[in-house]
Amino acid sequence: MKQVLIETIPFKVAPMQLTEGLKAPSGNPLVEGILATAEVKNGNGRYYPKDLWEREIDKYNQVVKENRATGELDHPDSTIISLKNVSHIIRECWWDGDKVMGKIEILPTTSGNILKALIENNVQVGVSSRGMGSLKEMNEGTLEVQDDFELLCWDFVSTPSNPGSYMQLVKEGKEIPTNSYVKVNSILTEILCANGTCPIF
């Protein structure tokens, strides 16, 4: 039976740099990195064959071309992308060996502004694929994703399941290391209270 399948990869921020990050033609910031890895058992015990990912990426690239490859911040267990929660749009997808790479534009929506602030302040989040499909046990502890799998989108979430992969802000210029730590609550407060009213108090 098909079910919602969610896979998450860590998302880490590059060190602060002297120049601003590269931006999309719209002026919005871009991030890039690994979206998924084929032919390996991930942190959820699932195995995605490469030919399965190749088929789905070919289909998804059409969605990218049509300017519809949006995703959410903190995705639901749903097959529907909620436009009111959209935070980003994927602009490019390509292969690097067994890794699916992507370039993502962060949108100036409520969720996108929160995501941008978190990334700029070195808060680690995860990039997570959302799809529908069924599973078959290969061996003890490993479930193979079956041919009925359908990729829906990629979302940004808080809990990583696939260690070792990350995305970073697309920047150029000399790097300046930083060890500053900013609490998530402080970032959210700054965003939500920017217009002079604070709905969280």
Language-model-detected regions and their locations in the chain:
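Noncatalytic, helix-rich "gating/capping" subdomain that lines the substrate-entry/channel surface
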Residues: V184-L192
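A short, polar/proline- and glycine-enriched secondary-structure boundary/capping micro-motif
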Residues: N44-G45, S82, G112-K116
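Glycine-rich loop at the start of a catalytic domain that most often binds anionic cofactors/ligands
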Residues: N85
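Short, charged/polar surface micro-motifs in flexible loops or helix N-caps
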Residues: V40, D77-T79, L107-T110
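Residue microenvironments linked to proteolytic maturation
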Residues: Q3-L5, P10-K12, E72, H88-N185
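Polar/acidic, low-complexity leader/linker segments enriched in S/T/G and N/D
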Residues: M1-V63, I176-V184, T197
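Short conserved beta-strand and strand-loop elements enriched in small hydrophobics
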Residues: N61-I80, V127
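Short acidic DE-rich linear segments
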Residues: I191-F201
